Amino acid sequence: MKYSIARQFEKNRKLRADNFVLVYQMGKVGSSSIEHTLEARNIPSYHIHTFDDHEEFHMYHNKKDVSKFFDFKNRAMYRLVLNQRKRILQKREQIKIVTLIRDPIATVFSRFFQDLHLQFIEGKKNDAIHRDMEVTYKHLEHCFDNYINLNYFADWFDNELKRNFSIDVMRQEIDNTQPFFTFNNHKASVILIKCEQLSSLDKEIGDFLNVDNFVLKNSNEAKNKWYSNIHQYFKQHYDFSKLFYMYDLPLYRHIYSQQEREAFKTKWLKTPGTKSA
């Protein structure tokens, strides 16, 4: 059984280990190499996006479509397990948390395609969605524009890190030209890393974790996804300037410098479908 007592007991034991690390961030911000490295070093860790539910239920407005991919009983059990694990972690005397942030448009775009199956429920009603690239694109453009809850990404640190571990990244004054930041209170120590700078921070992450000779290992995620053709077509045709307002949201203005945010815009302006502001 997925949620057998023995399996949960072993997981809970790991959550209480002295050198335990919580990898806690919104999806698609580049944490896989950290997870892989911790596992290779036999450092107990737990990777989670939210302690409330499967992340997809927070991330998309078309929840009826999302629910078709999750068994009701398993989902209810999963939520109970998440709540139990959260309580265990909150009761620790001290906890180290690794979290990341990424260009918001890159985050949203990557996550949408990871969850692409959620948007093909309509394909059962319209066979052309599976046969014609332009029809498929128009369908996905509609889904991208209307079904993603963009507030989920902008509010993640308040809804998760602040609510569950009393770490408020917005209250602390930071130099947002730096590649990472640390936050601390009486129970939690957090390192917040810009995904774009992750590969150059081996020593800094190792120092935070008190791990000697820490070197990030490639997660070897497969690049040839089943959706690669429509992914490329979408990227060539979509007007990403519709999401440029995200760079002016409080979270991204706080964490990323003006120069970094302008560089993100410049990158997306190079895609053929994106219009100049």
Residue ranges and their predicted role:
Residues M1-A277:
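Membrane-interface amphipathic segments in extracytoplasmic regions
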